[in-house]
Regions:
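Structured, active/binding-site neighborhoods that engage oxygen-rich ligands
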Residues: 2-473
């Protein structure tokens, strides 16, 4: 089969994608994922075909330039490009940060670690639970027949299916939420989640670990597509007119949507508030606002009198964000002394997995974005986070979702090339395929047909990176 034949086959698949209801079936057809194959889920070894490594390398080298060329050709301000940059930034951060997880702070060059086997034995370029759960969330959104809403039953089902597939990594809070999950008895259409919700709330309510935040990239992408005009109105009005009415409405809407996802594993109300503030940062980045404008939006929101009328949780977080931003603006602020010094309450290693570390790191890099050279910005930011050790994969993932769209895929630089260069089996390209299909789904579910003409070319590239000459019925 020649390249033209491959392109025609994939074009047929793309044509089928005009109906959003069959997206999940297309995913299962192409990648053989589904509940009928427990143990072969997402990042499992068994999900990939047995490919000759030499042939894979040959195919990879031949097609790598196609993928890079596609990325460089995209319009910087297209929604497709921006959403993809967000998810790709999160996934790349996860894959690279995983090599430094659970390590203590060190100013030494952490790249030496790449020569060793990380704590969870993942391969270079392999994503961990952060990105896998984000993909599960994307599946849940695509499978839900009510396209205008988020359904906790579908989210619980896909998270649970993943949790029972023996993933390489899973946090304690998440694991606890799915200890009683059963493939056989649970089906999302039966609204079964309400039967286990109280038990999860009782067990996990006190958890403020970062697991709820690390998976948000795909949900935020859905929100950007779903509430595009409301987001633009809210941001433009607060930036240009200092009017926060629409921004506050957006904040409450994001809290409501985030709650549907958070209650699956992290039912504490504080997680909804954190998710709202974080989502506003990511949405601002996807909209291609300058970092200082994103900071202005946050400060306008947090300083609004609205929060004095809210509960203690909203008010506390708003005041904390104002305080952190002012701290990070100080030119004498010492990054490593603040985040790396043992014994400090801010030490990333000491309080490993706490959501507040990731939130503060995201704020820090937004405030100081302009101090980095664009060419090496993504690399330098991940360098700094990885050097802190602790829960490095999740911190890099959460920060990466914001930084990705701000710098654009063409500026991922050495990190992007490094991840592509070291893939011995193609778990990472597989996740890129899922990202492409999900972003296309978001377009079609909103009946917005302004999709890039060469998206099929891109999907062909990433699929042939994995399979060489492929058969798609």
């Amino acid at each position: 089969m020649n390249q033209d034949d491959i392109k025609q086959k994939i074009e047929k698949v793309i044509e089928k994608c005009s109906d959003p209801e069959i997206y999940s079936n297309i995913i299962k057809d192409i990648f053989t994922i589904g509940i009928d194959k427990p143990g072969t889920y997402l990042n499992s070894l068994e999900i990939l075909p047995n490919i000759n490594e030499k042939q894979l390398k040959k195919n990879f080298e031949a097609n790598k330039r196609i993928l890079c060329d596609f990325i460089n050709q995209q319009k910087r301000d297209s929604i497709f490009y921006q959403i993809f940059s967000c998810i790709f930034g999160a996934f790349t951060g996860d894959a690279i940060g995983g090599f430094c997880e659970f390590m203590k702070y060190s100013k030494s060059n952490y790249k030496k670690i790449f020569k060793e086997m990380p704590v969870f034995q993942q391969l270079p370029g392999q994503i961990t639970d952060d990105s896998e759960m984000a993909m599960c969330l994307a599946y849940a959104i695509m499978d839900n027949p009510k396209k205008e809403t988020i359904d906790p039953n579908y989210i619980y089902f896909y998270y649970g299916s993943w949790a029972k597939s023996e993933p390489i990594d899973m946090g304690f809070t998440t694991e606890n939420a799915f200890k009683d999950f059963d493939f056989v008895t649970f089906h999302p259409q039966f609204n079964n989640f309400k039967n286990v919700q109280n038990e999860i709330s009782k067990d996990n309510y006190n958890s403020l670990s970062n697991g709820f935040l690390m998976r948000k990239s795909t949900l935020i992408a859905w929100m950007y597509n779903r509430f595009f005009f409301q987001i633009n109105q809210a941001f433009d009005d607060t930036i240009n007119n200092n009017n926060n009415k629409y921004l506050i409405e957006l904040y409450e809407k994001i809290k409501e949507i985030s709650h549907i996802d958070n209650i699956i594993t992290h039912p504490n109300i504080e997680t909804d508030v954190v998710s709202a503030f974080y989502s506003i940062m990511v949405l601002g980045a996807i909209k291609l606002l300058e970092p200082q404008k994103i900071i202005k939006i946050l400060l306008n929101l947090c300083n609004d009198n609205y929060f004095s009328q809210k509960g203690n949780v909203d008010l506390k977080l708003a005041r904390n964000i104002i305080f952190y931003i002012e701290q990070f603006k100080n030119k004498k602020f010492d990054f490593y002394n603040y985040f790396g010094k043992e014994g400090s309450n801010n030490c990333v290693y000491k309080h490993m997995g706490w959501y507040e570390h990731a939130l503060k790191l995201t704020l820090y890099f937004l405030v100081n974005f302009d101090t980095f050279k664009l060419k090496d910005l993504y690399k330098n930011i991940l360098d700094q986070i990885c050097n802190l050790g602790g829960d490095a994969d999740t911190n890099c993932c959460i920060v990466g979702a914001v930084i990705g769209p701000l710098i654009g895929l063409e500026n991922f630089g050495d990190y992007f090339k490094k991840v592509l260069d070291v893939i011995p089996r193609d778990r990472y390209i597989f996740s890129i395929c899922i990202m492409v299909i999900y972003v296309k789904y978001l377009y079609n579910s909103n009946r917005n047909n302004d999709i890039l003409n060469n998206e099929c070319y891109f999907l062909k590239s990433v699929l042939t990176l994995l399979y060489g000459e492929i058969e798609i019925d």
